[in-house]
Amino acid sequence: MYQSLMTVRETQIAIKEVKTFFEDQLAKRLELFRVSAPLFVTKKSGLNDHLNGVERPIEFDMLHSGEELEIVHSLAKWKRFALHEYGYEAGEGLYTNMNAIRRDEELDATHSIYVDQWDWEKIVQKEWRTIDYLQKTVQTIYGIFKELEGHLFEKYPFLGKYLPEEIIFITSQELEDKYPELTPKDREHAIAKEHGAVFIIGIGDALRSGEKHDGRASDYDDWKLNGDILFWHPVLQASFELSSMGIRVDSKALDEQLTKTGEDFKREYDFHKGILEDVLPLTIGGGIGQSRMCMYFLRKAHIGEVQSSVWPDDLREACKKENIHLF
C-alpha cells in the first residue's frame, strides 16, 4: 500500500521549497527575466498553443468588444511574440509562472485539467539552431534538477536521491530501432528504466515505421530540434515527463510543417506571418511542469497530491482506497 512520506501540511511547505529553488536557479543559469503572463489571448492572434491539434481551448467573448478570447493551453507561441515586442536580443530570454486549463486532458495519476509550469523562451542566433546547442541547454536544466534533488536531500533525507550523474540523449528514431516491438510509450518506460534520465530528440514527425513517437503542434517546435526530458519515477515505476522543449520553427521549418499537417490556413495568423516573413526572432524554449516537479522530487503517487484541481468522484474514491489523499 502506498504511503506518502509527508503530511499534507509538510507537503505544502515542501512544494514552496521546490518551486522557489528551481525558479531562482532557472533564471540564473539560463539568464532569464521573469515577466507577467496572460491567462487568455485573442483567438484571431493565433498565439494559443494548440498542443496536438485536437484539444479544444475554453472560449469566451469579451463584453466590451465582443472579441473572441481563449484560455491558454500554454504560452509556447506567446513567449516568442513577447520577446519581439519587449525588444530582447540574442542570448536574452524570459520566463513566466504559467497557469492554464486543458479541458480535454485525459485524467490520470500524472495529468490534470489544471496546468502550472515554468514557461521559458530565449532568443538564439541562426548558427545556434543545432542539436549540440539543444543538448547543452538540456544539460544545464538537468544540472538544476540535480542540484534541487541535493538541496531537498539535505532538508528531507528520507526522500532519497535517484537521479544519475548524467542525462543521456537518444533520438526518437534510435528509440524505435532499439525497441521496434514496443509502443512509443513503452519505449519511454524501457529507456527511462535503463538510464534513470533521458532526453528523447525529435518528436512530432513520422518515423520510418510511419508512426509518430508523439504528436506536436506544427507551429512552435522544429520537429528535428525538440524533445522531452524523462525521468524514471521511483514510486510509479514508470517513465515520467518533466519538460517538453525545443528550438522553435524558423520560416523554412514552419512552411514544411504546416504543409505536412494540412494547416495552411494558419499562414494568415499574425503570429505565423511573423515567422514566415522573418519578423519574429529565432528562439529556443520549453515548459517545465511545476506540479510534475513536485510530484517527482517529493515522491508522490498522484499529481493531485501536489496541486488543487477538480477530479471525478470515482477517481477520488479510487485514490482513497490506495491511500492517496488528493488536495
Swiss-Prot record:
Pathway info: Amino-acid biosynthesis; L-asparagine biosynthesis; L-asparagine from L-aspartate (ammonia route): step 1/1
Subcellular location: Cytoplasm
Pfam families in the record: AsnA
The family this protein is said to belong to: Belongs to the class-II aminoacyl-tRNA synthetase family. AsnA subfamily.
InterPro entries: aa-tRNA-synth_II (IPR006195), aa-tRNA-synth_II/BPL/LPL (IPR045864), AsnA (IPR004618)
The reaction(s) this protein catalyses: L-aspartate + NH4(+) + ATP = L-asparagine + AMP + diphosphate + H(+)
Top class in the EC scheme: ligase
UniProt xrefs under PROSITE patterns: AA_TRNA_LIGASE_II
Keyword Cytoplasm: yes
Keyword Cell inner membrane: no
NCBIfam families: asnA (TIGR00669)
This protein's GO CC annotations: cytosol
Top-level taxon in the UniProt lineage: Bacteria
GO biological process, one term: L-asparagine biosynthetic process
The protein's name: Aspartate--ammonia ligase
This protein's UniProt keywords: Amino-acid biosynthesis, Asparagine biosynthesis, ATP-binding, Cytoplasm, Ligase, Nucleotide-binding
Origin organism lineage: Bacteria, Bacillati, Bacillota, Bacilli, Bacillales
Single GO term (MF): aspartate-ammonia ligase activity
Entry's EC annotation: 6.3.1.1
